[in-house]
């Protein structure tokens, strides 16, 4: 996180978003989705990629903190791609409301809001590091994060996101 926070506008944005996510949020009513129900959303067949780690997950309930996570890792030569689906009952999503439409590009990185299907997303790519992230808000409840290293652009992240059945994931928010 130090590497990211030390850089200009993106660092300021991340610091503000980190602050917001630490503040008590209004949880979405409903049951926490168990990680076993989230694993199919990260278990993908990606053309040109092989699975590096078998999909895994965790569900945790402790007092006022509830969270489920499913994740999987892929590789293609020196390139890596990690996919995570998180259910925090909506407590991690206030930052998406702050970014209805944003675009920033510098000599070091690109940051912009986009749509992945019907869902709001924040896309970031660091040119020198060849590191990209795609963070998607699904039904104002689930946080889908795709992160890649060794990438020439964010196209592999977008292609992987397009293979995820995000509309089906949204139905679990009920």
Which residues does each PLM region occupy?
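Bacterial N-terminal signal peptides that target proteins for export
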Residues: 1-13
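Short, well-structured beta-strand
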Residues: 130-156
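Short acidic, gly/pro-rich beta-turn/loop elements at beta-sheet edges
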Residues: 82-84, 93-95, 146, 156, ...
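Short, solvent-exposed recognition patches
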Residues: 28-131
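Short loop/turn segments at secondary-structure transitions that flank enzyme active sites
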Residues: 89, 142, 170
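Surface-exposed amphipathic alpha-helical segments
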Residues: 148-174
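Bacterial N-terminal signal peptides
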Residues: 11-21
């Amino acid at each position: 996180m130090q590497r990211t926070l030390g850089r200009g506008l993106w660092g300021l944005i991340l610091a503000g978003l980190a602050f917001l996510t630490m503040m008590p949020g209004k949880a979405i009513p409903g049951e926490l989705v168990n990680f076993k129900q989230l694993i199919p959303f990260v278990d993908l067949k990606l053309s040109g990629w092989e699975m590096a780690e078998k999909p895994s997950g965790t569900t945790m309930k402790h007092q006022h903190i509830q969270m489920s996570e499913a994740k999987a890792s892929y590789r293609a030569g020196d390139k890596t791609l990690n996919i995570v689906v998180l259910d925090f009952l909506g407590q991690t999503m206030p930052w998406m409301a702050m970014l209805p439409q944003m675009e920033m590009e510098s000599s070091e990185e690109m940051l912009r809001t986009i749509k992945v299907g019907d869902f709001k997303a924040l896309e970031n790519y660091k040119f020198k590091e060849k590191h990209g992230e795609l963070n998607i808000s699904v039904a104002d409840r689930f946080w889908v994060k795709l992160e890649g290293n060794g990438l020439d652009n964010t196209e592999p992240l977008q292609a992987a996101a397009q293979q995820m059945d995000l509309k089906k994931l949204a139905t679990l928010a009920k």
